[in-house]
Curated annotation (Swiss-Prot):
Gene Ontology MF term list: identical protein binding; metal ion binding; monoatomic cation:bicarbonate symporter activity; zinc ion sensor activity; zinc ion transmembrane transporter activity
Signal peptide range: 1-27
One Pfam family here: ZIP4_domain
Protein name as catalogued: Zinc transporter ZIP4
Family membership noted in the UniProt record: Belongs to the ZIP transporter (TC 2.A.5) family.
Gene name of the encoded protein: SLC39A4
UniProt-annotated binding residues for Zn(2+) 1: 504, 508, 533, 537
Site features described as Essential role in Zn(2+) sensing, chain residue numbers: 508
Extracellular-side positions: 28-323, 377-404, 516-523, 577-583, 636-644
Length: 644
């Protein structure tokens, strides 16, 4: 007692040394002292602590105790400072877990800061348990010695319980002090859970009234694990063989059963219980759980119940390719349409332009209806899948669906021939023989596409003399050599045409974008259909602008401005139509657009047009119509054999 009174009082380490050297029977004594802040510390006790710590650790580079001195322990802080005892426990734990690294920290003067950092890492209930487990693993790897006879190994839950009993639950300082007590007693550490822990944890997840896991609880547990198929009810269990992509387990005694056969079979909760012969009424007992756990692990490791990765379709384009090919197709459509406008600027080519328009009319009807029925309709209805597996292709309808749709188109063609032949063979009114289109009201594409060859010429300028222009029928006074003021309706007509054509081109761009978002083959078919009907549309609109009295340059400018809206529709469709479901809906809208344009716009223009050579016109209409259908039919039948 005289020695203790002679030395400077320090609270913790003296008691710690006494605990470590005298092997006190109650390890909670140090924790109690740490919590109350009582006790004294002297250099003799510190020296004993150093010897004990050095004896428990093992250093590969030599004796570990040479770097640690009493002055280093005293430098951690004074006993009356807040948190000093917790820092001292953390510093000792650092030395036990990494003696060589701690020696470097001591020489660099950062031992205290490292101890504070460890306390900060362990602060909090969610950080203390895993951090303590990792710390114990490092201490176990560095410490030496055997536990006392009859003493059980200490694990993190025990350290946390002892710290909680002392009235300091969740605080890292008392937990580390408890750890030092067991280190001083030579206790061993169990850093991993026991096998029973896993069973207890799983059974704690069930909230039933029985100690066993029911079928429903097992199914919910397997769903959380991401394994297991759909559990059938007793009423539909006998229909198991009719389920798509579903296989049931065969008995374990099945002859010639290969383990590879089961690697991709997804089992339900009822299947797993049946494999191990477990009763659904009894449920899964803790003993049975140990039996069926390998089945759950196999299901997880094999990925049998994981969603199958969607393999990219063979004809699927990347996002950059969609924008590139879509832009090129739209640009080509606009340029070809603009090139066709040159025919209208040439007075000598007016007759040729007329027959070119009529040929494209027939081709537009064939391409639009062919693309809508032969290509887009099976795709929207899921009857024509590309890039699927062989099993799916065997179950698909194949060419049979395409040929049935061809029969539908043949019905359309038969009635077209009937009406056209009746028109050609039956007597006509004298007015109809003049080669002028039938009566119509207002502006429409049909009106602009029915202009006679003599009307496909731009009007003469005033200095070129008077000549019947495109509005001669509606405004006879314009035949006068004196320029007259246009009516308000005639002045608004070019802008109405441009606005309507811009909206139409925007819809065409949406259709092209949705098609290229699906595949390049669908984009090719849709682009062909759009091109075939866009050329006569643009020619007709250009003729209608000339009909309204606009000069060629201004009419060409308005026509190009309306064509730019197709790019806006293309980019909107590519930016928004990213999902397979939205793609199907967009293509369904494109089907309606194509059928409306073909049957309500183009086909009436073909039926109502009048020409001095009706049989030549009839031949050109049939060539265009059958040619458009033939191209789309070949593309629909053999597109899977085409490689980009």
């Amino acid at each position: 007692m005289a020695i203790l009174a002679w030395l400077e009082p320090r609270p913790l380490l003296a008691v710690l040394v006494l605990v470590l050297t005298m092997r006190m029977a109650q390890p909670a004594h140090l924790l109690t002292l740490l919590s109350s802040g009582q006790g004294a510390l002297d250099r003799v006790a510190l020296g004993g602590l150093l010897n004990t710590l050095a004896a428990r650790v093992h250093c590969t580079s030599g004796p570990c105790g040479k770097c640690l001195s009493v002055d280093d322990l005293l430098a951690l802080g004074r006993p009356e400072e807040p948190g000093h005892l917790a820092r001292l426990s953390a510093a000792a734990a650092l030395y036990l877990s990494d003696p060589e690294g701690t020696c470097e920290d001591i020489r660099a003067g950062r031992w205290a800061s490292r101890a504070d950092h460890l306390l900060a890492l362990l602060e909090g209930p969610k950080a203390l348990a895993p951090g303590l487990s990792r710390l114990l693993q490092r201490i176990q790897a560095q410490t030496t010695g055997q536990p006392s006879a009859g003493e059980a190994c200490v694990d993190p839950p025990q350290l946390l319980r002892e710290a909680g009993v002392a009235g300091a639950p969740g605080s890292p300082g008392p937990v580390l002090a408890t750890l030092l007590e067991h280190v001083g007693r030579g206790s061993c550490f169990h850093t991993l859970p026991t096998p029973q822990y896993f069973v207890d944890f799983v059974f704690q997840q069930s909230h039933g009234n029985t100690p066993n896991i029911s079928v429903a609880e097992l199914a919910a547990l397997m769903q959380r694990l991401g394994v297991g198929g759909v559990t059938e009810t007793h009423s539909d269990h006998h229909h198991q063989e009719k389920r798509v992509n579903r296989q049931g387990p065969t008995p374990l005694t099945a002859p010639n059963s290969s383990s590879d056969t089961w690697d991709t079979v997804c089992l339900s909760a009822r299947d797993v219980m049946a494999v191990y012969g477990l009763s659904e009424q009894t449920g899964v007992t803790p003993e049975a759980w140990a039996q069926l756990s390998p089945a759950l692990l196999q299901q997880q490791l094999s990925g049998a119940c994981s969603p199958q990765p969607s393999h990219p379709a063979q004809n699927q384009l990347s996002q950059a390719e969609k924008y590139l090919y879509g832009s090129l197709a739209t640009l080509l459509i606009c340029l070809c349409s603009t090139f066709g406008l040159l025919l209208l600027t040439c007075a000598a080519c007016s007759t040729a332009a007329h027959y070119v328009i009529q040929t494209f009319l027939g081709m537009a009807v064939g391409a639009l209806t062919g693309d809508a029925l032969l290509h887009l309709t099976p795709k929207v209805l899921g009857l024509h899948q590309h890039g699927g597996d062989s099993e799916h292709r065997a179950d698909s309808h194949g060419p049979q669906t395409t040929w049935r749709l061809v029969v539908a188109l043949s019905g359309l063609y038969v009635f077209f021939l009937f009406e056209k032949l009746c028109d050609l063979l039956l007597p006509q009114d004298p007015e109809d023989r003049k080669g002028t289109p039938r009566s119509h009201s207002g502006h429409s594409h049909g009106m602009s596409l029915q202009l006679a060859p003599r009307e496909l010429r731009p009007p003469k300028q005033p200095h070129e003399g008077s000549r019947a222009d495109l509005v001669a029928e509606e405004s006879p006074e314009l035949l006068s050599p004196e320029p007259r003021r246009k009516s308000p309706e005639l002045r608004l007509l070019p802008y109405m045409i441009t606005l309507g054509d811009g909206l139409h081109n925007f819809a065409d761009g949406l259709a092209v974008g949705a098609a290229f978002a699906s595949s390049w083959k669908t984009g090719l078919a849709t682009s062909l259909a759009v091109f075939c009907h866009e050329v006569p549309h643009e020619l007709g609109d250009f003729a209608a602008l000339l009909h309204a009295g606009l000069p060629v340059s201004r009419a060409l400018l308005l026509n190009l401005a309306s064509g730019l809206t197709a790019f806006a529709g293309l980019y909107v469709a590519l930016a928004l139509g990213v999902g397979e479901e939205s793609e199907s809906w967009t293509l369904a809208v494109a089907i309606g657009l194509f059928l409306y344009v073909a049957l309500c716009d183009m086909l009436p223009a073909m039926l109502n047009v009048r020409d001095p050579r009706p049989w030549l016109l009839f031949l050109l209409h049939n060539v265009g119509l059958l040619g458009g259908w033939a191209v789309l039919l070949l593309l629909s039948l053999y597109e899977d054999s085409i490689a980009l």
